[in-house]
Curated annotation (Swiss-Prot):
GO molecular function: growth factor activity
Residue(s) carrying Sulfotyrosine: 110, 112
Protein name per the record: Phytosulfokines 2
Signal sequence residues: 1-34
């Protein structure tokens, strides 16, 4: 009867050792993945090139300085904003205009209050 007790204790020890091995592997991979490099700031990656942001139709459109373009994209965005402003001044879709203005103001506040130097 002592042999059955010895076999069960050795299998329990083997199971415990296997469990510890799996736990060790899991945590080593977890910490290796968590130890990745911190991404650099946008200004450092772009070589100091600043981005000009414009909000149009509830979307953020970025145009980098030095991009090749004829300027029609910006004038189209400005024209769309002017048309929406004219429609709002006429009193059409007043609730929609107020909601659009609040959303664009909140979006601009978010853009300008981000902490660029902190990861």
């Amino acid at each position: 009867m002592s042999t059955t007790r010895g076999v069960s204790s050795s299998s329990a020890a083997a199971a415990l050792a296997l469990l510890l091995l799996f736990a060790l592997c899991f945590f080593s991979f977890h910490f290796a993945a968590a130890a990745r490099a911190v991404p650099r700031d946008e200004h450092q990656e772009n070589g100091g090139v600043k981005a000009v942001a414009a909000v149009a139709a509830d979307q953020l459109v970025l145009q980098l300085e030095g991009d090749t373009g004829n300027g029609d994209e910006v004038s189209e965005l400005m024209g769309a904003a002017e048309e929406e402003a004219a429609a709002c001044e006429e009193g059409k879709n007043n609730d929609e205009c107020v909601q659009r203005r609040l959303l664009s103001d909140a979006h601009l506040d978010y853009i300008y209050t981000q902490h660029k130097n902190k990861p």
